[in-house]
Amino acid sequence: MSVHSKLYEGKAKILYTTDEPEVLLADFKDDATAFNAQKRGSIIGKGRINCSISSQLFQQLEASGIKTHFIDSPAPNQMRVKAVKIIPLEVVIRNIAAGSLSQQTGIELGTVLKQPLVEFYYKNDQLGDPLLTRDRLLLMELATAEQVEEITHLALQINDFLKNFWQNCGITLVDFKLEFGLDSQQQILLADEISPDTCRLWNTTEADPNRRVMDKDRFRRDLGNVEDAYQEVLQRVLTAVEIKN
C-alpha cells in the first residue's frame, strides 16, 4: 500500500488517501484537546496508545458481529480503515452520570442510570457540538429515521459489549462517544476510535474521585499522570484480550 495525499486532519488523527480508493490510512497524533479545542496540549505516546487500544477493541467488536471501518494496523500509531462518509453526529452513550449530564440536570456525579442513555450531538465545532433532539436531527437531515434507529440499536449493542469488556479489565465504563459512517454500499459502519480520548473510564477498585480517572479527564482537569493512565488502560486491554483468546 502506498500513501498518497492528506485528506483530512482532525484534533486527534490525520487521514491519508492510499492507492486503494476505498482504503484510508489513519495516523493517530499525540495532540490533546479539550473543551472544543480551547485547551490544547500533548500527551506523549497518545497516538500509539489510542491506535493500539482502538485496534484491539475494533477487532473484538468485529468478532462479536459489529461491523467497523477497521482493516488492520500497519504501524503502532497507524490504522488502515475503510473509507466511509461520516454521519455528522457524535453518539454518546451514558451508563453513569458524569460530565455535562450532571452539570445540566443536577443528577449527582456517579449515579448509576436505570438504563443507558443515548444522546446525539451535532458534529460541528463552530456551533460547539450542540445536543440535538431526534426531531431536530431529522429536520436538519443529518440522518434518516431508519438510520437513527439503526445507530441507536448499534450503540446499545456496542455498549453492552464494551461494558463487559472494560469490566474484565477492572475498569468501569461511565460513558463514551461513537461515530458512524456510510460505506460505498450505504452500510452503516462504526468509525473513528474507541480509546481513553473518547471514553470516560474509572478504575473499578479506586474510590477516590480523582485517582480513579483513567481517561482524558486527567488532561481536562489537570489531574496529572495522563501518560501513565493511558498506558495502564492499554496494558489492561492487552491482558484482557490475551486471556479471552
From Swiss-Prot:
InterPro entries noted in UniProt: SAICAR_synt/ADE2_N, SAICAR_synt_PurC, SAICAR_synth, SAICAR_synthetase, SAICAR_synthetase_CS
GO molecular function: ATP binding; phosphoribosylaminoimidazolesuccinocarboxamide synthase activity
EC number, as in UniProt: 6.3.2.6
GO biological process: 'de novo' IMP biosynthetic process; cobalamin biosynthetic process
SUPFAM superfamilies the UniProt entry points to: SAICAR synthase-like
Catalytic activity as recorded in UniProt: 5-amino-1-(5-phospho-D-ribosyl)imidazole-4-carboxylate + L-aspartate + ATP = (2S)-2-[5-amino-1-(5-phospho-beta-D-ribosyl)imidazole-4-carboxamido]succinate + ADP + phosphate + 2 H(+)
Pfam families named among the record's database cross-references: SAICAR_synt
Pathway: Purine metabolism; IMP biosynthesis via de novo pathway; 5-amino-1-(5-phospho-D-ribosyl)imidazole-4-carboxamide from 5-amino-1-(5-phospho-D-ribosyl)imidazole-4-carboxylate: step 1/2
The entry's keywords: ATP-binding, Ligase, Nucleotide-binding, Purine biosynthesis
Gene3D superfamilies per UniProt: ATP-grasp fold, B domain, Phosphorylase Kinase, domain 1
Family to which this protein belongs: Belongs to the SAICAR synthetase family.
PANTHER family: MULTIFUNCTIONAL PROTEIN ADE2 (PTHR43599), SI:DKEY-6E2.2 (PTHR43599:SF3)
Descriptive protein name: Phosphoribosylaminoimidazole-succinocarboxamide synthase
